[in-house]
């Protein structure tokens, strides 16, 4: 037996993989080979040549030939070799380096495979092989995906570093230009000061020269008149005075030069101080601008939240008053004078309530609760939506929809058996009083809302144009606010602020020749505002889901947004997936942006519309909203048609039951 086979056989005997075979491991192997218990200690001592209490590989290889006949270790080695060869053959059937993909689990899996192979269970062996193949394939796919993500991250870091380098270079150029300009100005001022001092000094020298010439002439004239001795004495005195005056002038000149040097040093200090103060002023100005912008943003959102809180309080008061009035009217209906009439009343529509009659106060309270939940979910909590759509959902006292909704939920008519007992005029008076009480309670509740309508809004509500709610969704930075600004005002701003909470706009469009009002809600894309976005998805008719074509992360998060939308809505609503910022694709390297093919495949998977747009250039902005509005219009019409069919079938079923059973 060669060295490799001996090494493999020694590893099989080494149960704990410690590199040496102890007595317990040797005993286990001997029992598997049916060696008598009396001979185990003798055989172990033959292997343990150095007597240290365990068998290393040198002892094992030296004494193997001597005790191989007793232990039959060769047959054990051949068996292990065949099992190892089976694992190697299976490993060759897999693509790539299996040990590289399995890592530290390779040894355990190979031993498990050898154990299963030794049992000759083909079904279990096939299942284990399929499991290993699937595991290797999945690990390979994960590694490829990790490499792709690392490549994307590396590209993003390179782009960011290049942009930072360009910004630093521009800033450095601006600083150099500013420093050069300041130096030139200060040098010009210094040259002017030195020139003025030189002119002054030259004038003083000219005056001195004139004085010397005048004194020289006087001396010559006096020398002619006086004796030579007196002339010489006077001349010496004059020369001495002139020399003293010349020394004084020189001293004053040196002092002036020293003053100029001191002024130059002070000027340099003032320059440095001016530069530092200018930088400090710029930093403080930037901080102040940021603080002002944050203050304005927080103030606007605080006002919005206060208005929303006020609306919720007013809505709560209205619901309480409506509940109390309904309880009072129920008690009046249960009085002995009207005992015959309520006993035979039945509801006109029961789509929003259970199908029992109004025979007790508990059913009435349940109906009022359903009515409250319906109107709280219809958008009353948002003040801006009330102001914009005051003529549709919650209008003034003359609103047809408000009265009709309350009438369908609460109005009562006599049953068929009651027609013969009660006069029609009395029934009509009772129905009018019931509807009037509910309508008056609704009017009192709505009067608490600060609704302000001008003449144009009243005209719009009279036209009864259909209103659809569209929600803008997507990651932060995908261009939702710019998309809404381009749609509403046909403008683009590069310095638009990040949306905090929600934003709201109304767009009037002609959809298939019909005037349509679109409420478009811009939701914030940050994680902390996801709960706010879910509440708007719940009552939306359609969703504009945006992603940035230059950002793979925003595209990958589209699936998460779709799941949130489906979790928030009771049924599937129309969606339009929009790839924004296509104008930036030409400036990016090929392959770094999300292609339109991937966007189309994703939209097909979710049965949604798809287009690519540019809020900066205005490309496909109106078209995307128009197509989604058409789908929303179709969806709403189908929903109303199915709802009317369900109500009709329920009405027929009740009529059949009443005819059969006399209810």
UniProtKB/Swiss-Prot annotation:
| Subcellular locations according to the entry | Cytoplasm, Perinuclear region
Query: Which Gene Ontology molecular-function terms are recorded?
Result: calcium ion binding; GTP binding; GTPase activity
Q: Which keywords, in A-to-Z order, does the entry hold?
A: Calcium, Coiled coil, Cytoplasm, GTP-binding, Metal-binding, Nucleotide-binding, Repeat
Residues of the EF-hand domain:
1-33, 35-70
Residues the entry annotates as binding Ca(2+) 1: 14, 16, 18, 20, 25
Q: Which domain of life is it from?
A: Eukaryota
Q: By its UniProt entry, which Pfam families does this protein fall under?
A: EF-hand_7, Ras
Record PROSITE patterns:
EF_HAND_1 (PS00018), EF_HAND_2 (PS50222), RAB (PS51419)
Q: Where does Ca(2+) 2 bind?
A: 48, 50, 52, 54, 59
GO biological process, alphabetically ordered: vesicle-mediated transport
**In what ranges is there compositional bias, type Polar residues?**
324-336
In this chain, GTP is annotated as bound at 477-482, 580-583, 615-616
Keyword Cytoplasm assigned to the entry: answer is: yes
Residues passing through the membrane, by range: none
This protein's assembly is summarised as: Homodimer.
Q: Which family does it belong to?
A: Belongs to the small GTPase superfamily. Rab family.
Per its UniProt record, what NCBIfam families does this chain match?
small_GTP (TIGR00231)
Protein's job: Binds predominantly GDP, and also GTP.
Which protein is depicted?
A: Ras and EF-hand domain-containing protein
Q: Which organism is it from?
A: Danio rerio (Zebrafish)
